[in-house]
């Protein structure tokens, strides 16, 4: 069971799809991530304010994005290839009354393009729509007995003007995905000077740092490797 650890929505249960295809971060690892992001140079909640833009790649339930929003981040963009997981995440956003602070893009993160205006989540008509109000019909999460009735409301998510303060990358393990995602983020200028990148990967996976990336923290947790990085346009 996933819960929000701290902030405005503390102890809220984050619903997840049954028979999920993704691997959600463990509670221990999630606590470790946010302990790092709220201590040391980040003490005083510097990363989480009304202007903070979050990008959650391979978002699944959106646990990391929702935790960030609970702690004060202003806006989050969740990207995942699994339609049903995003639909449930959108319903959860609406239940928290933060549907206007979240975009959902239903696409393989490796195929994301800067020049595209996405209509996030797919409907049966194979159209892309966005935000928590976008979904048609009812999504019911059995374990929490939460029912979401979501009307259609189309809104675009324009990735061409997006720049993010904090990026979460939590892809399937052992797929050599992280290097490809990092190249995509840098190529499309979605990172700015000082952007923090949090990567969860298998301890056996490797990532050769780009010249513009510095390590803030690197640690092993069981079979997982956690990297907290900073992008700097000044590094050469």
From Swiss-Prot:
Keywords (A to Z) from UniProt: Methyltransferase, Transferase
Keyword Methyltransferase attached: yes
Protein species of origin: Rickettsia prowazekii (strain Madrid E)
GO terms for MF: methyltransferase activity; nucleic acid binding
Protein name (record): Uncharacterized methylase RP545
Gene3D superfamilies for the chain: Vaccinia Virus protein VP39 (3.40.50.150)
Example GO biological process: rRNA methylation
Any Pfam family matching the protein: Cons_hypoth95
Segment forming the signal sequence: none
Domain RPE1 insert: start-end pairs: 117-160
Record-linked PROSITE patterns: N6_MTASE
EC number of the protein: 2.1.1.-
Top-rank lineage group of the source organism: Bacteria
UniProt cross-references to NCBIfam families, sorted A to Z: RPE1
């Amino acid at each position: 069971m996933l819960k929000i650890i701290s902030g405005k929505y503390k102890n809220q249960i984050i619903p997840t799809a049954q028979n999920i295809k993704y691997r959600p971060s463990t509670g221990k690892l999630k606590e470790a991530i946010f302990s790092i992001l709220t201590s040391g140079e980040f003490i005083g909640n510097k990363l989480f304010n009304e202007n903070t833009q979050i990008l959650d790649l391979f978002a699944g339930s959106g646990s990391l994005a929702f935790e960030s929003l609970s702690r004060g981040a202003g806006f989050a963009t969740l990207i995942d290839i699994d339609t049903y997981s995003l639909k449930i995440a959108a319903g959860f956003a609406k239940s928290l009354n933060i549907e206007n602070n979240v975009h959902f893009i239903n696409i393989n993160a490796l195929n994301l393009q800067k020049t595209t205006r996405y209509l996030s989540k797919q409907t049966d008509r194979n159209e892309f729509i966005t935000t928590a109000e976008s979904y048609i019909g009812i999504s019911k999460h059995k374990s929490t007995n939460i029912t979401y009735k979501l009307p259609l409301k189309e809104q675009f998510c324009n990735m061409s003007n997006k720049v993010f303060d904090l990026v979460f990358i939590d892809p399937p393990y052992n797929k050599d995905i992280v290097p490809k995602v990092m190249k995509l983020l840098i190529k499309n200028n979605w990172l700015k000077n000082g952007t923090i990148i949090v990567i969860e990967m298998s301890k056996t996976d490797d990532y050769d740092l780009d010249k513009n990336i510095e390590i803030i923290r690197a640690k092993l947790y069981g079979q997982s490797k956690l990297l907290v990085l900073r992008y700097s346009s000044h590094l050469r």
